[in-house]
Structure formats: structure tokens, C-alpha cells
């Protein structure tokens, strides 16, 4: 108050006012401070001071011909004085108002296209719903979040090339547009922006917003998808939150969400196949998400999720150096350890071989609903500070940390045998065995852990074995904090290796990820996921397996047919028949297979019994390892729709129905395709290509000249005979048919005739 009085007193004297307004500032240090460098030192003051002047804005000289000197109120809009140091004129802020009201109108057609991200944001907010405000403590943790909804996922470099190509197509400079997304976007934008009058620089800025993912490290207590982040300032404060439902979704969030679901499904499926790594790669390469190849998305998308990271590792991409255990992301913040195998005894006297980490280490643990700081040393937890949304989440984090600590009292708390298995029916490793055990029931673990008196520390309270909070006592070393633990901020990526069982290791050999870490959570993808791989047929249940198997046979009928006659064993071992086996009752699989294989052999041996539909119908049953038995079947059972349904060996059934006139096959009422007997030239099976339109007369006859190749056959005239070289290097005599009508039956009798002609 004294100071203010003094200042008032000074200001009342005219001399003071004169000094402050008229005299120059001539202290060198001050002049230096405010004039060195291009950076404005006090932007808000500068702005206020400038706007207080009469003509704070400079404009191109042409403006004087387009704007009157005075407005309707008689206020001067521009000065006759030139701007010092340029050939521009000085104008008043009122000139801007006049221009906005009375200036020329240009076409606005490009605005929504250029400012697309803004227009869409307005729509989302218009249709969004804001709920009540709740006052409560907010546990916010800093996470790396996407702050820019509605973007494509191009890298900065890719986007730069696209922008240059769209905005400055004639500029010189090497631009190579390689990825599919780059080409599509460039084409689309060039069309949209024809005759666009908006300044190229503005267009470039806006395109950047649309093409590149921008991330920031922000404190968040709720949803992390970009449509929530754009309203972060409206939905959460230090002590309040406001409920909000976005008024629309954006493709980038949908891609992230669908990518996670696809990756989880693929890793889970690959883990149970004979060669997990090969299967995983095959599935990643043959899957599309929202019409884009999954491998392209993986290369561009920075999502950090366990299954996604396993897929990235398999593709040889770099991933984050943190590791996963029990759904928590662990990042070592200090210390180091060496690993050593040790045998320990559980409370049930079962021996476990665990890899013990020897040495002092500190970690941050970040999960979906809880976070923690963990300090540990060899097989001992020193301190655990947890924060979480609720009691349940806090308990989950405590269990994980206790298991991770490898303490003896945790291992001794095991009651009963540990025999958890993964999806492939293999035993889990000991650490995951312990984890599963205590996740089912942690009562004994918490009771045996031990409790201690605690000091009163700001922001921290104790927690008892029954998960009630306390200010006096707590489980040994464990405290609950009001503050969350920030996610690891660095976006650094490291080179990793992956083994055939999908275990991902860093270059020091530490396991960062394994299929056990992949969440079992099921969700519904926002974008269509198309799995072309037969391994994923079962994802939509037994019916889908059935339909897909038969669709596959029909689509590939030309090659299947040749293999059926020449190399059946190879055909039976095809990976596409693997999912089907799970539909056939286990006890009878072998007998069915033996029966069908015998039936097929008879067809091959006995002329004229070749029956296309029957082969298609029974083929999947022949894929199981056959048991020899004298059993005959008139129908075969498959387990779909929760019960056994019958496929008739001869004739149609609801499961398998072939309409001879339309040549359409329906499986369980679903269309499974049409049997076309006109193969694509060149890709068709060798024999079929020979036979369609030719009659096989018998063994080679030298009188008809040297053997022709299949391609030379097309030159024969109707009724002309020739020797021809077929599949296995055998030569047979054929005659080109005189009539086309009988062509269809050729393929059915041909295989027989070839066999007879050769034998």
C-alpha cells in the first residue's frame, strides 16, 4: 500500500509525467534487452501499445485504391504517411472492419475443404453432450496423447512431400510419393483445390494438420482418444471434471482402436499355431483395416500397445524400450540388475525355476486404471507408491508389484498347485503362473505380507490387507498416493529381436513382451477388419469356418482338382483345412478321414465316378490324420450352431446344398460361391487346360508328329489329332472336339483317361 501511495503521489506531479512520457530511455542495458534478437520480449505489452496507436497496421499500397479514406462515421481509415522502412502504407484497425463489411466477396467454396479440421471440430462440439460437473480429486497422469483429431498417419517427411506436390506442384525439388496413402491423398487434394484463392501458405498449414499426427505429453484423467483431448480444458480441472460425450468419431481414433483389436486377435491366434512367428507375419500381411493394409498402418501408427508392439517387432520395426508385465508398462528409471536362475519352493512345496533380478532398481508402472512407483532390490520390495481410480485398480497394481518383487513371502503364499496354461495348452512361465494365481485370489498374499506403523506424510496414506485406507498402519512398504505417476515421456524407439514364440527382447536380451502380456479383452472394431488368412476364419465362430473353407475350395477349384488327382497328400496337408478340424468331433475325426480318403482313391481308380460336388463336400474331412477302419458313413457330423449337424455323403443337406442348375453352393444357407468350370487361361490346372474341348484317345501315336506343348494346342482345327505333353512328362494322343456342348464333361472323365492312357 505504501508503495502505491508513493507512486500516486509521484504521478500527481506534472514533472514526473513529463519525464516518463517525453524523455528517451538511454540506458544501454535496457535498450539491449528490448532490441536484441528477433524474439519479442513482451508480446502482450507490445500488442496493447501498438493497438493504442492510430495506424498500427501496414498494408499493401494497392489498398488505398480499394478502401475509402474515411468510413461512414468520417473516421480516417489510412494514413498518407508511409511505413518506415517499406513501401507499405499505415492503416487503422477500422480499415479491417470496413474491409470485412464492405470488401469484395470471393468464393467460399474452398473454405470447408481447407479448414476441414476446424469445420469438423465445430460439428463434433455441436453434437457433443456435456453432462454434470463433479467436484472430486483428479488423479491426472501425463500421457503422450494425440491432440489433432481427423488426421491421416503420414510421417512428417511423407506429409511434406504431399504438401509440396499439392500446393507448389511446379517447384523444383526431389519429391518421391511412394506409399499408397500419399498418392491417394495427393490426387484427392489436387482435385479439391482447383482454382483455390486461399494463400498457399495457409493451405500448407492446414494440410499439415490433416496429414500428420501431433502428440503432446499432457496430464489426463480420462479418455485419451483425440476427440476427448480436444476438449481437455472443458472436461477436467484440478478438482473438478465434466462429463462429455463427443459428437462424432474421427478416423484416426478408429484406426488406433481397430489396430489394437486386430493385433490382439492375430497374436492370440498365432500363439497357438505350429510356427507362431511365421503365422503372425502371414496374418499381418494379409489383413486389411478399413481398406488399408495392416502392415502399412503398423509402419505409420505410433500406438504403444502390447499386441501392436509384438506385430511391429515381427516386422523389424523399432518399438519403445519399456517392458510389459501383467498389463502394466514398466520403465526402469534408475539402478540396474543382473539375471540369475534360482529354484524356489511355493507354499505347496512345488519347485519353481525363476529368473531372479539381482540389484537395486526403481521403476514406474503405468496401467490403464492405476500407476505406481516401485523401488526394489534382489527379491525384496523396498517401497511401492500406488495411485488408482478405485480400490480394485489399486489392488491389481499391488498384486503385480508384489509378484514382480519375487519376495519369498509372496512365493510362500501360494496355496495349491500352479498349473496355468496358455491358449496353446502350454504351461505358462513361473512368473505368470504366480501372477495368475494371485490375480484369482490375493487374500493370503496380502495377509502374509506384513504390516508396519507409518509416518504422517502429506498426500500419502497407508493401506491394510483388506484394502481399507489407514493413517496409522499399512502393508509393509506400500503407500497410496493422491498423485498419479506420469507415463514415460520419451518417444525413443529401440531395435528389438523376436523369437519364433513371439517373445520380444531388447539388445541386452531382456524380455520386453510376450504373448502372455496380450490382453484378453474383446472389443468390437470401429473399422472393418478383413482377415484374408485362413487362420482367422474361426474368429467369427464355427459357421464362418465352414463357409470360408468351402468358399476357399471353390475359389481355388482348378488347382485343387489337379492336386486331388496327382498329389492328394499335399492337398490334405494344406493349412486352409486346419480350422475345419475343430468342427469335427474329436473321437471320430480319424475314422472320417480314413473313410473319405478311401472313397477318393476309389474315385481315382474307377473310371467315371469322379463327382465334383462330392469331392468339394468331403475334402475338408480328409485333412485329419486318417485311422484305417472298415467303417462306412452315410453322413458326417460337424459341430455348428451349438449342436452336431449332418453333411450327407450323397445328396444335399441344410449344411451343404449344391444346386446343379445354378451351380451355386450354399453352406448353412449362406452363399459360398459358384462353381465355374471355365478356368482363367494360363493359371488353370495343366490337365484341365488340356482337356477342356479335347478328347483323350489314348497313348502317344508317333504318326501325329512330335508332342506339342499345352499352349500350342489352341492352334488345332476341330477334329484334328495331336500328341501332347502333360503334367508329369507323359505324352497322350488327343483330338480337338467337333462340338462345344460336351466340353463340360471333359474335366470329369479326363483324369481317369489320362491315368488309363499312361498306364
From Swiss-Prot:
Motif (Nuclear localization signal): 736-739
Main location: virion
GO (cellular component) term, any one: host cell nucleus
Keyword Oxidoreductase in annotation: no
GO biological process, one term: DNA-templated transcription
Sites annotated Mammalian adaptation: 627
Alphabetically ordered keywords of this record: Cap snatching, Eukaryotic host gene expression shutoff by virus, Eukaryotic host transcription shutoff by virus, Host gene expression shutoff by virus, Host mitochondrion, Host nucleus, Host-virus interaction, Inhibition of host innate immune response by virus, Inhibition of host MAVS by virus, Inhibition of host RLR pathway by virus, Inhibition of host RNA polymerase II by virus, mRNA capping, mRNA processing, Viral immunoevasion, Viral transcription, Virion
Gene3D superfamilies according to UniProt: Polymerase Basic Protein 2, C-terminal domain
Keyword check for Transferase: no
Coiled-coil intervals: none
Location in the cell: Virion; Host nucleus; Host mitochondrion
Assembly behavior: Influenza RNA polymerase is composed of three subunits: PB1, PB2 and PA. Interacts (via N-terminus) with PB1 (via C-terminus). Interacts with nucleoprotein NP (via N-terminus). Interacts (via N-terminus) with host MAVS (via N-terminus); this interaction inhibits host innate immune response.
Similarity section: Belongs to the influenza viruses PB2 family.
Name of the protein described by the UniProt record: Polymerase basic protein 2
Species annotation: Influenza A virus (strain A/Fort Monmouth/1/1947 H1N1)
Encoding gene, per UniProt annotation: PB2
Amino acid at each position: 500500500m505504501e508503495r502505491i501511495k508513493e507512486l500516486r503521489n509521484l504521478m500527481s506531479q506534472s514533472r514526473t509525467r513529463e519525464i516518463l512520457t517525453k524523455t528517451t530511455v538511454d540506458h544501454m542495458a535496457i535498450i539491449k534487452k528490448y532490441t536484441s534478437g528477433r524474439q519479442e520480449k513482451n508480446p502482450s505489452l507490445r500488442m496493447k501499445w501498438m493497438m493504442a496507436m492510430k495506424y498500427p497496421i501496414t498494408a499493401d499500397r494497392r489498398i488505398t485504391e480499394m478502401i475509402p479514406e474515411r468510413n461512414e462515421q468520417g473516421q480516417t481509415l489510412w494514413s498518407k504517411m508511409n511505413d518506415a522502412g517499406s513501401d507499405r502504407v499505415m492503416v487503422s484497425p477500422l480499415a479491417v472492419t470496413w474491409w470485412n463489411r464492405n470488401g469484395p466477396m470471393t468464393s467460399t467454396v474452398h473454405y470447408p475443404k481447407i479448414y476441414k479440421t476446424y469445420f469438423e471440430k465445430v460439428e463434433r462440439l455441436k453434437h457433443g453432450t456435456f453432462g454434470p460437473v463433479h467436484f472430486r480429486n483428479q488423479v491426472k497422469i501425463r500421457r503422450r496423447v494425440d491432440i489433432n483429431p481427423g488426421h491421416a498417419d503420414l510421417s512428417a517427411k511423407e506429409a511434406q512431400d504431399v504438401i509440396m506436390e499439392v500446393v507448389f506442384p511446379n517447384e523444383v525439388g526431389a519429391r518421391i510419393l511412394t506409399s499408397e496413402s500419399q498418392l491417394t491423398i495427393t490426387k484427392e487434394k489436387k482435385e479439391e483445390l482447383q482454382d483455390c484463392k486461399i494463400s498457399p501458405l495457409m493451405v500448407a498449414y492446414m494440410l499439415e494438420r490433416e496429414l500428420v499426427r501431433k502428440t503432446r505429453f499432457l496430464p489426463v484423467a480420462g479418455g485419451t482418444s483425440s476427440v476427448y483431448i480436444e476438449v481437455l480444458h472443458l472436461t477436467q480441472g484440478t478438482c473438478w471434471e465434466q462429463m462429455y460425450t463427443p459428437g462424432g468419431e474421427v478416423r484416426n481414433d478408429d484406426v488406433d482402436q481397430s489396430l489394437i483389436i486386430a493385433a490382439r486377435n492375430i497374436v492370440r491366434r498365432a500363439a497357438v499355431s505350429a510356427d507362431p512367428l511365421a503365422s503372425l507375419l502371414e496374418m499381418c500381411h494379409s489383413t486389411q483395416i478399413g481398406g488399408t493394409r495392416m502392415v502399412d498402418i503398423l509402419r505409420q501408427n505410433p500406438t504403444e500397445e502390447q499386441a501392436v508392439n509384438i506385430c511391429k517387432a515381427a516386422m523389424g520395426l523399432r518399438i519403445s524400450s519399456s517392458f510389459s508385465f501383467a498389463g502394466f508398462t514398466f520403465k526402469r528409471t534408475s539402478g540396474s540388475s543382473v539375471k540369475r536362475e534360482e529354484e524356489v519352493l511355493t507354499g505347496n512345496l512345488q519347485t519353481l525355476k525363476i529368473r531372479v533380478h539381482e540389484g537395486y532398481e526403481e521403476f514406474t508402472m503405468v496401467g490403464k486404471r492405476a500407476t505406481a512407483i516401485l523401488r526394489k532390490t534382489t527379491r525384496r520390495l523396498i517401497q511401492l507408491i500406488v495411485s488408482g481410480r478405485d480400490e480394485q485398480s489399486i489392488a491389481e497394481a499391488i498384486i503385480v508389484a508384489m509378484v514382480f518383487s519375487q519376495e519369498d513371502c509372496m512365493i510362500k503364499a501360494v496355496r495349491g498347485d500352479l498349473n496355468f496354461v496358455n491358449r496353446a495348452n502350454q504351461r505358462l512361465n513361473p512368473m505368470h503362473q504366480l501372477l495368475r494365481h494371485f490375480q484369482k485370489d490375493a487374500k493370503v498374499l496380502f495377509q502374509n505380507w506384513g504390516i508396519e506403523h507409518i509416518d504422517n506424510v502429506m498426500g500419502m496414506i497407508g493401506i491394510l490387507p483388506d484394502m481399507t485406507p489407514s493413517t496409522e498402519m499399512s502393508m509393509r512398504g506400500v503407500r497410496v498416493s493422491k498423485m498419479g505417476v506420469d507415463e514415460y515421456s520419451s518417444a525413443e524407439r529401440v531395435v528389438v529381436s523376436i523369437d519364433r514364440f513371439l517373445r520380444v527382447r531388447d539388445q541386452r536380451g531382456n524380455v520386453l513382451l510376450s504373448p502372455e502380456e496380450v490382453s484378453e479383452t474383446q472389443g468390437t472394431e470401429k473399422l472393418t477388419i478383413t482377415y484374408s488368412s485362413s487362420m482367422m476364419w474361426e474368429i467369427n465362430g464355427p459357421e464362418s469356418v465352414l463357409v470360408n473353407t468351402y468358399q476357399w475350395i471353390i475359389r481355388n477349384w482348378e488347382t485343387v482338382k489337379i492336386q486331388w488327382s496327382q498329389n492328394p497328400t499335399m492337398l490334405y496337408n494344406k493349412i486352409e483345412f486346419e480350422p475345419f478340424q475343430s468342427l469335427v468331433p474329436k473321437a471320430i475325426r480319424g475314422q472320417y478321414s480314413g473313410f473319405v480318403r478311401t472313397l477318393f482313391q476309389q474315385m481315382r481308380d474307377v473310371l467315371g465316378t469322379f463327382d465334383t460336388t462330392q469331392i468339394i463336400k468331403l475334402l475338408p474331412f480328409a485333412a485329419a490324420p486318417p485311422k484305417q477302419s472298415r467303417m462306412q458313413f452315410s453322413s458326417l457330423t460337424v459341430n455348428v450352431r451349438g449342436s452336431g449337424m449332418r453333411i450327407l455323403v450323397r445328396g444335399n443337406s441344410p449344411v451343404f446344398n449344391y444346386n446343379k442348375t445354378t451351380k451355386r453352393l450354399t453352406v448353412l444357407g449362406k452363399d459360398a460361391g459358384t462353381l465355374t468350370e471355365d478356368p482363367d487361361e494360363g493359371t488353370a490346372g495343366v490337365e484341365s487346360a488340356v482337356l477342356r474341348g479335347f478328347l483323350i484317345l489314348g497313348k502317344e501315336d508317333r504318326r501325329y508328329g512330335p508332342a506339342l506343348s499345352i499352349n500350342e494346342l489352341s492352334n488345332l482345327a476341330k477334329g484334328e489329332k495331336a500328341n501332347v505333353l502333360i503334367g508329369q512328362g507323359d505324352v497322350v494322343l488327343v483330338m480337338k472336339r467337333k462340338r462345344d456342348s460336351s466340353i463340360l464333361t471333359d474335366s470329369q472323365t479326363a483324369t481317369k483317361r489320362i491315368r488309363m492312357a499312361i498306364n
